[in-house]
């Protein structure tokens, strides 16, 4: 399946949300369009189960047609939370590789270019060993999937337990250990970064964080931002999202993010609390757009 992209890149920033695929993955596109989003993240299968029905060709056709009608805005998928690329057992490793390969294959069939995944937990093996294992397993999934246009986006974490990727150097370590680093990018989650100790509220500290990301991995690898406020404090090592401007990060951090010309082209996707309708997403997107204006 060919990837879908916009012919004319918009001048405004691309802002969207993770949308439900209830009723069919194409419904997520319809929900994004109805909310006024210009970026989208989806689950292409049940994210909390190891096994899922195969993606039917009809469903793939409905999805790609919906994306074209919407305008070809960027779409990413988020891989299952069950995947642990740094698993410390052969069984856990094989299950994670097989599931990640399925995620990548589904994305390829849907024309989705980016699959976000957490780098995993090293379970006491140490960060260096965990990074090497994560790279080897993700490389294997990329080889199995048969979708050469799809990129793995490693998402930074809040550093809970033995989770890898709390630091930008930790994300870079996985990429450096890969045999195919050109297939990897980075997804920056603002709430996770804050939980891991990156203070994004102060201009100087925010700039230092982005410069650190650039030095460690290169800003050219940053393909997606998860714009989430945090219910928990700086360095809490906890992952709790809330509405933009209503958490510990506050509007100051997102004003810096939205006015950072280095990241102007990077899609910003919300993973904030939802209600029964699109109102919460529309509210949060409106806040981001407002903060982008000088």
Curated annotation (Swiss-Prot):
Superkingdom classification of source: Bacteria
Keyword Nucleotide-binding: no
Cofactor: Zn(2+)
Record carries keyword Membrane: no
Enzyme class, first EC level, given as a word: hydrolase
Annotated Pfam families: AP_endonuc_2
Binding site for Zn(2+) 3: 192, 239, 241
Gene Ontology biological process terms from the UniProt entry: base-excision repair
EC number: 3.1.21.2
Database matches in PROSITE patterns: AP_NUCLEASE_F2_1, AP_NUCLEASE_F2_3, AP_NUCLEASE_F2_4
GO molecular function: deoxyribonuclease IV (phage-T4-induced) activity; DNA binding; DNA-(apurinic or apyrimidinic site) endonuclease activity; phosphoric diester hydrolase activity; zinc ion binding
Cofactor note: Binds 3 Zn(2+) ions.
The entry's keywords: DNA damage, DNA repair, Endonuclease, Hydrolase, Metal-binding, Nuclease, Zinc
Binding site for Zn(2+) 1: 78, 118, 155
InterPro entries: AP_endonuc_2, AP_endonuc_F2_Zn_BS, Xyl_isomerase-like_sf, Xyl_isomerase-like_TIM-brl
Similarity comment text for this entry: Belongs to the AP endonuclease 2 family.
Its job: Endonuclease IV plays a role in DNA repair. It cleaves phosphodiester bonds at apurinic or apyrimidinic (AP) sites, generating a 3'-hydroxyl group and a 5'-terminal sugar phosphate.
Protein name (record): Probable endonuclease 4
Naturally occurring in which organism (per UniProt): Oleidesulfovibrio alaskensis (strain ATCC BAA-1058 / DSM 17464 / G20)
